[in-house]
Each structure stands twice: as structure tokens, then as C-alpha cells.
Design a protein with these regions (language model features):
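Conserved blade-ending motifs and adjacent loop-strand segments that build the rim/top face
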Residues: 249-258, 313-333
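A short helix->beta-strand "capping" segment at the edge of beta-propeller domains
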Residues: 28-53, 316
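Surface-exposed loop and turn segments in beta-propeller and other repeat-based domains
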Residues: 41-49, 90-101, 140-148, 184-206, ...
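Asp-box/WD-like beta-propeller blade repeats and closely related beta-sheet repeat scaffolds
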Residues: 123, 130-161, 165-166
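Beta-strand-rich domains and repeat architectures in extracellular enzymes and scaffolds
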Residues: 45-76, 279-291
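Structural signature of eukaryotic scaffold interfaces centered on beta-propeller domains
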Residues: 57-60, 106-110, 154-159, 203-218, ...
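Short, conserved, GDST-rich strand-edge loop motifs in beta-rich repeat architectures
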Residues: 282-303, 351-353
């Protein structure tokens, strides 16, 4: 597997000294989040034949089928497998610039029958359906997203047949769009302590506060975890409550160039899953400086995180798992007592963990 690193980020850091910039840093410090239980887990590597992965990023298991997303797939971005034996059935989401192809992928949602995938460059949602023979995915439609969604990177199905997308323009936390991609409303705000800077640099804050999101419709719990810094937000949309949790890394730190925001603090979270019982978050906790120095020395740090944190649906710390692999994506199956994870640093990326 080819290992892909953020070389463009390193180049941008290299030219920071050429510009006058504004540095956005947290106003106050927060204590480290502590967990009452910590457990070390040893994973079992599961071979995936027939597919060459460049950057296996996300996976979802639904019934007897699995979809794995390759963020930088050379030919296709998505791969359908059987479960639990992981026999490859079909590759779909062809890479390219044609009308039936995808230029990029970021997030997807799969319920076992219907899959929605997000193409950031084309600003559209694409829908596939599992065939009657259950051995391939059939492309059915594409939906152009409202221009107000701006840089859509993550998406979850939400209430009343709508979709929820983090708003990277910075003037709200989310954009809610209907089944046709039209904006229904914007809501929420970035929970920064630097309100004045947010008003001055909304686009920079929108990017700097990029978050991974997930929603559990049964409980009405919506969670966002920042990629940079260490902030997690929990909404209970049924009870209309909102809680903000800030850890030791605090709010995202970044420097503002003429038209960009460059993260300078630390990478906090990598993925999130909300089940009906708990919140699971991959935590990386590595500073951008350490990441860059290791890369410059030719010894890049593993991508992903080796810690999975478990919170209650109310945000109380429950447990922290220490993994023997650095992983980018997880899929927790509480009923089976296991967690599937993707190690992008390995030629055999699929790892099974037994949860204790």
C-alpha cells in the first residue's frame, strides 16, 4: 500500500514566515479528560483479497454486507464485501471527472440497502442501491447541493428525510438540506471563546473547526468531534440540549493567511460513531509540529490514532481503549462485542478487536 502524507501541509508551513498572519489560540486552558477504565486491546488482522487500497479510510457493516471507503482509490472509491467472511463482491464509485464519476470522496452513509456518498469538488450527493442479487451497487441518482453548504466534507441523514452538513463558512455550525439538496436552514454556532475573532474571520474558523459528525436517530443524539484541537459537542435534538466538552488540547489553533487558515496546534480526533448506547471517538493527540518534524526526518508518524475513547450519550467519560494499531476509521458492533478498524499504515488494513 502506498502511504500518503500531508506533504502539501508541510509546504504551506514552510512559507508561513513569508506572510504577516493572525494566530488564533484558545483563551483558557482545560484539564485533561480522564477515564475511569483503561484497557489495552490486541487486534486480529483480517486479509482482504482482490483490492488494492491506497488509503482505507472508513467502513460500515450492515447485516451481511460491508462497504469500505478508499479515500484515494486509484480506480474506485468504494468496495462491497460480504460479512463476516469479507469476500469482495463489487467496486463502485469510479474515480474521474465524467458525469457518472466522482472526483473526490469524503463521507458516506450506508444502511444496508442505500448508500449516499459525498463528492466535495462536485458539491453533490450520489445515491446507490444494493442490487436484487445483493452482489453489486447500482448508481441511481446524484443531487446537487445548495451553494450555501460550502465545502461539504461530512454528512449524516437527519430528521424528516433531510441531511445535516457541517457549515465551513463559519456563520453557523450546520446546514440542513432537504432530499433535493436545497437549504432548509442553518443552525448552531461554533462554540469558541474567541467570539470577536470568529466575527472577523468566519471562513477561517469554519475550516479550523472542521468536525467529524454522527447521528443516532433512535436516541436523537448528534455528536461533532473536531479534527484539530480537542472539542466534542453533543446535541440531544429530542430534548433540545447542547453540551460542549473541551480537553487538554482545547480549541483548534490555526494561523490565518490572506485567504487560508493553517492548523498549527494538534490533531485531536479522527473518526466518530454514535451507537444507541455510547459515543466512540478515535483520538490521535499529536501536535502538528511533531508530525512535521518527523516527516522532515524521513520517519513520518503513523496516520490515525491508537486510542478509542468511549463516552456516555450524555458525554460522561466511560472507558479508554489503547490499540496496537494506529487506525483511521472504526465500526463498533456492540451486540457482537467487537470493533472493526482500518489501519492505513499497513498493507493489510482491516483489524478486528474484541471489546472487553
Amino acid at each position: 500500500m502506498q502511504r500518503l502524507f500531508l506533504s502539501s501541509f508541510s509546504l504551506l508551513l514552510g512559507v508561513l514566515s513569508l506572510y504577516a498572519f493572525t494566530k488564533i489560540s484558545p483563551k483558557a486552558s482545560h484539564s485533561e479528560i480522564t477515564f475511569p477504565v483503561m484497557q489495552e486491546l490486541q487486534g486480529r488482522v483480517v486479509s482482504l483479497d482482490s483490492v488494492f487500497f491506497r488509503y482505507p479510510y472508513r467502513l460500515e457493516v450492515r447485516g451481511d454486507r460491508v462497504v469500505i471507503e478508499d479515500l484515494h482509490g486509484p480506480d474506485h472509491y468504494y468496495h462491497l464485501y460480504t460479512y463476516p467472511d469479507f469476500r469482495h463482491l463489487h467496486s463502485f464509485g469510479q474515480r474521474g471527472e465524467g458525469p457518472e464519476e466522482m472526483q473526490t470522496v469524503d463521507d458516506f452513509y450506508w444502511n444496508g440497502q442505500t448508500l449516499w456518498a459525498l463528492d466535495n469538488i462536485k458539491s453533490e450527493l450520489v445515491r446507490w442501491e444494493l442490487s436484487d442479487s445483493r452482489d453489486k451497487m447500482l448508481r441511481k441518482e446524484r443531487i446537487k447541493l445548495d451553494k450555501a453548504t460550502f465545502r461539504a466534507l461530512d454528512i449524516v441523514p437527519f430528521q424528516n428525510n433531510s441531511f445535516l452538513i457541517p457549515n465551513y463558512s463559519g456563520d453557523s455550525r450546520f446546514c440542513q438540506v432537504d432530499r433535493n439538496g436545497k437549504l432548509l436552514k442553518k443552525w448552531g454556532e461554533i462554540p469558541t471563546e474567541r467570539k470577536d475573532d470568529l466575527q472577523k474571520y468566519p471562513y477561517a474558523f469554519g475550516y479550523g473547526w472542521r468536525s467529524f459528525i454522527d447521528y443516532a436517530p433512535k436516541t436523537g443524539i448528534l455528536v461533532a468531534a473536531t479534527q484539530f484541537g480537542e472539542v466534542m459537542e453533543i446535541w440531544n435534538v429530542k430534548k433540545n440540549t447542547h453540551k460542549v466538552i473541551k480537553g487538554k488540547l482545547d480549541e483548534p489553533e490555526f494561523k490565518i493567511l490572506p485567504e487560508y487558515a493553517i492548523p498549527t496546534g494538534a490533531v485531536g480526533h479522527c473518526d466518530i460513531q454514535v451507537t444507541d448506547r455510547a459515543i466512540y471517538v478515535i483520538y490521535r493527540g499529536v501536535s502538528m509540529k511533531d508530525d512535521m518534524l518527523a516527516h522532515q526526518k524521513g520517519k513520518p508518524l503513523p496516520q490515525g490514532g491508537k486510542t478509542v475513547r468511549v463516552f456516555s450519550l450524555e458525554g460522561e467519560p466511560l472507558k479508554e481503549y489503547k490499540l496496537d494499531h494506529s487506525v483511521s476509521g472504526i465500526w463498533v458492533m456492540e451486540g457482537e462485542g467487537k470493533m472493526w478498524a482500518l489501519d492505513v499504515n499497513s498493507d493489510e488494513p482491516l483489524v478486528e478487536y474484541k471489546l472487553k
